[in-house]
Design a protein with these regions (language model features):
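Cytochrome P450
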Residues: 1-419
Length: 419
């Protein structure tokens, strides 16, 4: 599969281009724009964000080598100073700093270390039968059906139950948690924003209030009766001899559940779309399951679940020939760096034999994704079981995208399950 070039408005001078304009994200990331930026101005300044006029401008980092540099230099590019999303105004900084993804060392390292033992490849592999059982049970619900939506009826319930089992969330609450996460992370999409996209702050505040209320109930229960789930780990964690505060526990919970819900769902759905649009590639993977691990890596490369994460410059510095001032936002665009022509031949083509290195989990450094082993195992099982159960699966309609410059994922993927 080679993705068609996206149509775009008449190109302004690249120096005046606003990367986060809604028009660029209606059908997924603006890959043609990113290609132009990598070629002409790989570290690019956007002066303003139309939908949030009060927001400060930001630097876009689009080339893989530059993303690698920013990701590994936390002393120059801080997660804690300004948070990890580009628009400060829609997510309170005190909440961002309560997640270890929004911290700098040493606190980041100490908090993340509490979970690393539970996310090693060996520990995650021990859950393979459990995860496969979850995926099979989700597919069983489609028995007798001719059509379904792979996003809402396969990906979402499967990943919600997997992360829910790790966190101690009752299965009957999976759908409610998934809806809250979708609203909190994709409030600029009208389908997730009942208050309207012009009221993003109110939408996020409403979702976060419900998240705090629900999570506080779980926290109280585990203080009363500790369990062996990750929520209990957060409740009983100590960093520098101090228990985590309530909002830190809630935001740690939020981070793990949000990542568990969105990352695998996004990459599986887009990976399946790529296979469905290239029947030759689909047939190769269906007929030779040994190609599934490479398919997983190629899907991660082409379709990273999160389009960007942000850092803030701690001092004046130079990157890609551009002078960056202390306090300015620096945005790493994984949706661009994973298609960098200097690293990948024909980067817009989905190739199950490529088995690439990529930056879908970050580009190394302190914030490399904690859940890589879990995501890879979930994706492997989802691809295996879907193609084994439905060898003749095909597209049944036009996929739709979440309208977001942060989440890189499909909102719907209608398919015909049988020939």
């Amino acid at each position: 599969m080679t993705e068609p070039s996206q149509s775009s408005p008449t190109r302004k001078d690249l120096e005046q281009e606003r990367v986060l304009e809604r028009e660029h994200w209606m059908d997924g990331p603006p890959h043609e724009l990113f290609k132009e930026m990598r070629g002409k101005c790989p570290v690019h300044w956007t002066s303003e964000i139309t939908e949030v006029p009060a927001a400060a401008g930001f630097w876009s980092v689009t080339a893989a080598d530059d993303v690698h540099t920013v990701s590994r230099d936390w002393e120059t590019y801080s997660s804690e100073l300004g948070g990890v999303v580009v628009i400060d105004e829609v997510f309170p900084i005190e909440l961002a700093r309560a997640m270890f993804i929004g911290m700098d060392p040493p606190k980041h390292d100490r908090l993340k270390a509490l979970f690393q033992a539970g996310f090693t490849p060996k520990r995650i592999a021990a859950h393979e039968d459990e995860i496969r059982e979850i995926v099979v049970s989700v597919l069983d619900r489609l028995e007798g059906r001719d059509n379904c939506d792979l996003v809402t009826e396969v990906a979402q319930p499967a990943v919600s139950r997997v992360i829910g089992s790790f966190m101690g969330i009752p299965e009957e609450d999976d759908a409610a948690w998934a809806e809250l996460m979708n609203t909190a992370l994709a409030a600029n999409d009208s389908d997730y924003s009942p208050e309207g996209v012009e009221n993003i702050e109110e939408t996020i505040q409403r979702a976060m209030t419900q998240i705090f209320d629900r999570c506080s109930t779980m926290i109280a229960a585990r203080r009363e009766n500790p369990t062996d789930d990750l929520t209990s780990v957060l409740v009983n964690a100590e960093v520098e001899g101090q228990k985590l505060e309530e909002h830190e526990i809630v935001m740690g919970f939020f981070l793990l559940v949000a990542a568990g819900n969105d990352s695998t769902k996004a990459t599986y759905s887009s990976g399946m779309r790529a296979l469905l649009e290239d029947r030759e590639q689909l047939a190769m993977v269906r007929d030779d399951p040994s190609l599934v691990p490479g398919t997983v890596e190629e899907a991660l490369r082409m379709f990273p679940a999160f389009a960007h994460f942000r850092r803030t410059a701690t001092k004046d510095t130079v990157l890609g020939g551009q002078e960056i001032k202390k306090g300015e936002k620096v945005v790493m665009w994984y949706a661009s760096s994973n298609r960098d022509e200097t690293r990948y031949e024909d980067p817009d083509r989905f190739d199950v034999h490529r088995n690439p290195e990529h930056q879908a989990f970050g580009a190394g450094g302190r914030h490399f994704c904690l859940g890589t082993a879990l995501a890879r195992l979930e994706l492997k099982i989802l691809f295996e079981e879907t193609l084994a159960r439905y060898p003749d699966i095909s597209l049944a309609g036009r996929p739709t995208f979440v309208e977001s410059g942060f989440l890189n994922q499909l909102k719907s993927l209608p398919v015909k399950l049988t020939a």
